Amino acid sequence: MPGNSPHYGRWPQHDFPPFKKLRPQSVTSRIQPGSDVIVCAEMDEQWGYVGAKSRQRWLFYAYDRLRKTVVAHVFGERTMATLGRLMSLLSPFDVVIWMTDGWPLYESRLKGKLHVISKRYTQRIERYNLNLRQHLARLGRKSLSFSKSVELHDKVIGHYLNIKHYQ
């Protein structure tokens, strides 16, 4: 009988921390800087928005092609400064080959490094962009689900990346 259960009519209690208290890390702990080499790293940016489509929020991240994991991520505007923050997070890692699409800022930032510019060699990270859009409704382009604050937008996506890739 449903009325006899002590939990009938009440939501189950979980010990999930509130999203505002989350402090997701921005770099993986699975790969040790200096001791492990990242042979192929793909870099890309993904568009999202907070509140209205005119308030754009970009996710920049690097993906280890062989380990199939995200190495580091940052949020911000689609500028050289945000790309620079991502590159500073990636500086402790030994990356042999960088693979990006044709965005000109990648070319200027990766000057002097082994850099492949091709849509063919960014298939995995582009596929992962689609996976993120499928798993996180707030990243969908035409959706009723969207982030209302920049803080929660960054924390929810960062927490997802922590669970899937960084632990």
Swiss-Prot record:
Q: Does the keyword Transmembrane helix apply?
A: no
Q: Alphabetically, which GO biological process terms does the record hold?
A: DNA transposition
Q: Which UniProt keywords apply?
A: DNA recombination, Transposable element, Transposition
The text of the family note is:
Belongs to the transposase 27 family.
The answer to whether the entry has keyword Protein biosynthesis is no
- Described purpose of this protein according to its UniProt entry: Absolutely required for transposition of IS1.
Species in which this protein is naturally found: Escherichia coli (strain K12)
Q: What is this protein called?
A: Insertion element IS1 4 protein InsB
List the GO molecular function terms: DNA binding; transposase activity
Pfam families, from UniProt?
Answer: DDE_Tnp_IS1
